Design a protein with these regions (language model features):
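Extracellular glycan-modifying ectodomains
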Residues: 1-314
Length: 314
């Protein structure tokens, strides 16, 4: 049963794997653009990296917004950071630092006003640097660098549990009105073998279950993984690579999610807003026709009524 009740004014942060992107983008289509923030650090997959970046938003964190040791330079002379995904690239270390600091500040402002935090784990396999100033650090992304630079390992379950318990305790202290919702990505890690993929998902499920039990209504779990693997349970609902869920499967999960998390107010708001936005995207064959002018008048009236009821549609 959900402890989350999303309203038209709710502000939601999504962080984690590609599945967080998919669900986040669908929610963003239902709400004004400034009320949904999706993967501000880029796509993240493992619970170590996700916790590391979220910890920078705690009130007493002393490593804001990134570790200076995490910068590195590609052969192409571009600069990246091991705690951020590949979309953050700059021609100099200083330029990248400025970019990351600005993005972090925007996210920090959002976190302080957020109502819910969605976290999607994907795997407990992590990659740690073998050498350099950031040696032994778990990277958020390998940035297509040679695998000889990394040590692959399975994150220790007891350590994960202790770290996430400490983090959630601090997060609840700093943001007591927020809800935290975990999900598990249904992506299948064939590169580890299907047996190890199953074990990895099981360990993450046990971690999430332990956290949900310890934190009561503050932390909950939405069963996207089970919906696809147990309810749909058919390769028809996977993409052509047989690893990613298909658009049809994601749409089905989204329908279940709206039932689970949406209040009646948000359901009505999203339905009315979607209809108006769809009409606004209409491209007429003859813009000067009487029929189109009448259509525009009806659209203007729809927008007026919507904004009188709900506020700005943007």
């Amino acid at each position: 049963e959900s402890s989350l009740q999303l309203l038209p004014q709710s502000r939601v942060l999504f962080i984690g794997s590609c599945f967080a992107d998919h669900v986040g983008q669908r929610l963003a289509a239902c709400l004004p653009s400034n009320q949904v923030c999706i993967n501000p650090h880029g796509t993240l997959y493992n619970p170590v990296s996700i916790r590391n970046v979220l910890a920078t938003y705690l009130a007493d964190d002393v490593v804001k917004p990134f570790s200076e040791a995490g910068f590195f330079q590609l052969d192409s002379d571009e600069w990246r950071h091991w705690d951020y995904a590949t979309k953050y690239t700059a021609s100099s270390r200083a330029a990248l630092a400025t970019m990351l600091r600005e993005e972090w500040q925007l996210t920090a402002d959002f976190v302080r006003r957020a109502d819910a935090l969605f976290i999607t784990f994907s795997t407990d396999h992590v990659y740690c640097l073998r050498e350099g100033e950031y040696r032994d650090a778990c990277v958020a992304n390998c940035h297509k660098q040679p695998m000889r630079l990394f040590r692959e390992e399975v994150a220790d379950w007891n350590t994960l549990c202790a770290q996430w318990t400490a983090f959630l305790s601090a997060y609840h202290r700093d943001y007591p009105k927020q809800k935290v919702i975990f999900t598990l990505s249904p992506y299948r890690y064939a590169k580890y073998g299907m047996h190890e993929n199953a074990l990895s998902k099981s360990r993450l499920l046990l971690l999430i279950d332990s956290l949900c039990r310890d934190f009561g209504s503050f932390v909950s779990y939405f069963p996207a993984y089970e919906i696809i693997t147990d309810e749909l349970r058919d390769y028809r609902f996977y993409a052509s690579d047989m690893l990613h869920p298909s658009e049809q499967a994601i749409d089905y999960v989204w329908e279940q999610f709206t039932t689970w998390a949406f209040t009646p107010q948000l359901t009505a708001y999203a339905r009315e807003r979607s209809a108006i936005l769809r009409d606004m995207q209409h491209r007429p064959i003859n813009p000067n026709s009487e029929a189109h002018q009448q259509f525009l008048q009806r659209l203007t009236e729809k927008k007026r009524k919507f904004e009188a009821k709900w506020g700005s549609i943007d």
